[in-house]
From Swiss-Prot:
Named cofactor requirement(s): Fe(2+)
PANTHER family: PEPTIDE DEFORMYLASE (PTHR10458:SF22)
Task performed by this protein: Removes the formyl group from the N-terminal Met of newly synthesized proteins. Requires at least a dipeptide for an efficient rate of reaction. N-terminal L-methionine is a prerequisite for activity but the enzyme has broad specificity at other positions.
The keyword Iron appears for this protein: yes
Cofactor note: Binds 1 Fe(2+) ion.
Reactions listed under catalytic activity: N-terminal N-formyl-L-methionyl-[peptide] + H2O = N-terminal L-methionyl-[peptide] + formate
A Pfam family annotated for this UniProt entry: Pep_deformylase
Gene Ontology biological process terms, A to Z: co-translational protein modification; translation
Family (UniProt): Belongs to the polypeptide deformylase family.
Gene it is expressed from: def2
Protein name: Peptide deformylase 2
Entry-linked Gene3D superfamilies: Peptide deformylase
CDD domains xref list: Pep_deformylase
Entries under InterPro entries matching the protein: Peptide_deformylase, Peptide_deformylase_sf
Length: 155
């Protein structure tokens, strides 16, 4: 489809709770837009609100050939009691990062591109990525959860 502009912090789409997808066929183009857009930037995840579409769709791709996920209407169904802090960044708030505490492990369920219900269990970076992107669907950015924020400088 097309590479879309990634909206930045303060944009209305990033503040809204996104609408559930009723039919996966209605978001095929959106999914391709997310894939095309993420391929052009240095990031591992992109949620539909980040391209100004308030639908509950997330695309994650670690670029390793193994960790690629399309999540439609994702729901967190379980989290570990153990948490840890790590730094997060966001394509919608470039040149910044923040220290965020998140559960070490998570279980989510979501529809895939074919409309099949899948359950995923993840730890560490993948769990953090799932939660970060699902937050976007709730109108939450990592800066809302960060204990500390830093502005990055270019070399």
């Amino acid at each position: 489809m097309a590479v879309k502009k990634i909206v930045q912090i303060g944009h209305e789409a990033l503040k809204k709770v996104s609408e559930p997808v009723k039919d996966v066929n209605e978001v095929k183009g959106l999914i391709q837009d997310l894939k095309d857009t993420l391929a052009t930037v240095e990031g591992i995840g992109l949620a539909a609100p980040q391209i100004a579409v308030n639908k509950r769709v997330v695309y994650i791709n670690f670029g390793d050939g193994e960790n690629e996920y399309v999540l439609i209407n994702p729901e967190v169904t379980g989290v570990s009691k153990e948490t840890y802090e790590d730094y997060e960044g966001c394509l919608s708030y470039v040149m910044h990062e923040g220290l965020v505490e998140r559960p070490r492990a998570v279980r989510i369920q979501a529809l895939n591109e074919k409309g099949e219900l899948k359950v995923y269990e993840a730890q560490d970076l993948l769990a953090r990525c799932f939660l970060h992107e699902i937050d976007h669907l709730e109108g939450i950015m990592y800066v809302d959860r960060a204990k500390e924020m830093y502005e990055l400088v270019e070399k």
